[in-house]
């Protein structure tokens, strides 16, 4: 009996010790994880300390290559220095305007720095090229021809201008009433040229603080040079390019500074850099003459309201994928839309489809188009007539 009691006692004791061992093992694993985390933090802090203890570098901008692994750099506020380039730096990448790091003691170039660009400017670049094509634009054959000569031809075939001995055009201005296809044509140009497309609205360049708008314009053209060939599309240019007056308001003077920086950039960059500028506005009458002069804007393309044949072509384009009943007379519909813009013609097709959906039909009838014309003209007729009178 005593033997059985001792056996049970030690058996329970062993079970208790095994439970304690399992708990201690679990605690040990947690402590090992904490130790590993602390060791990682110690290594990170040691690396930071070593980085902080390293000698600092000065930032400079390359002005010109001088040969034999030497470049002329500009530093603020010291001035310009002729410095050596360390063997680890790619000498071919050192071009004018590139930011470099200089040793604090010897001023040798030891690293190439990335270009400093404002995040707001980086967001202006359209990564995905628009899928608009010239076939999706109706009634603008002459405008398409003119903009292709100024923008697309110099980018795709610059040798033609070199053989003729003429300078490439720098920019083009698209002007006309709202809804006549200015932005749509700019998207189509970006699609067919297959180059970087940078879109910016003029109101985005109007900033609160002095000098911010000018800085955005400078960095916008810097980014365009880095990603050349590129197209800068500036919509609503009248917000910063209006005629200068004698106003002493701070807001007006800041807008004028932004426009002066834009004029400087248009004069500064070379035409063979594959940077083209497209500007669009509804109010060409208020633009400053300095912005419109030849050499900055080489061609001005007018976008008038479409005539009857152009409206018919636009109707055919936007109704191409619609499920239409037989016998629809698009010519009659186009003749009823006198003075309408291309955007209003597209709105008629959309409204006609909405009338068909309202009656649970899968096809669009002639009556749907007629009701859509009546609705669109009733909704926008008075407003657009006032705008056209203003633009005359």
UniProtKB/Swiss-Prot annotation:
Keywords: ATP-binding, Cytoplasm, Nucleotide-binding, Nucleus, Proteasome. The keyword Cytoplasm applies. Transmembrane segments: none annotated. GO terms for cellular component: cytoplasm; nucleus; proteasome regulatory particle, base subcomplex. PROSITE patterns: AAA. It is found in: Cytoplasm; Nucleus. Gene3D superfamilies: 1.10.8.60, Nucleic acid-binding proteins, P-loop containing nucleotide triphosphate hydrolases. InterPro entries: 26S_Proteasome_ATPase (IPR050221), AAA+_ATPase (IPR003593), AAA_lid_3 (IPR041569), ATPase_AAA_core (IPR003959), ATPase_AAA_CS (IPR003960), NA-bd_OB-fold (IPR012340), P-loop_NTPase (IPR027417), Prot_ATP_ID_OB_2nd (IPR032501). Pfam families: AAA (PF00004), AAA_lid_3 (PF17862), Prot_ATP_ID_OB_C (PF16450). GO terms for molecular function: ATP binding; ATP hydrolysis activity. The 26S proteasome consists of a 20S proteasome core and two 19S regulatory subunits. The 20S proteasome core is composed of 28 subunits that are arranged in four stacked rings, resulting in a barrel-shaped structure. The two end rings are each formed by seven alpha subunits, and the two central rings are each formed by seven beta subunits. The catalytic chamber with the active sites is on the inside of the barrel. Acts as a regulatory subunit of the 26S proteasome which degrades poly-ubiquitinated proteins in the cytoplasm and in the nucleus. It is essential for the regulated turnover of proteins and for the removal of misfolded proteins. The proteasome is a multicatalytic proteinase complex that is characterized by its ability to cleave peptides with Arg, Phe, Tyr, Leu, and Glu adjacent to the leaving group at neutral or slightly basic pH. This is 26S proteasome regulatory subunit 8 homolog.
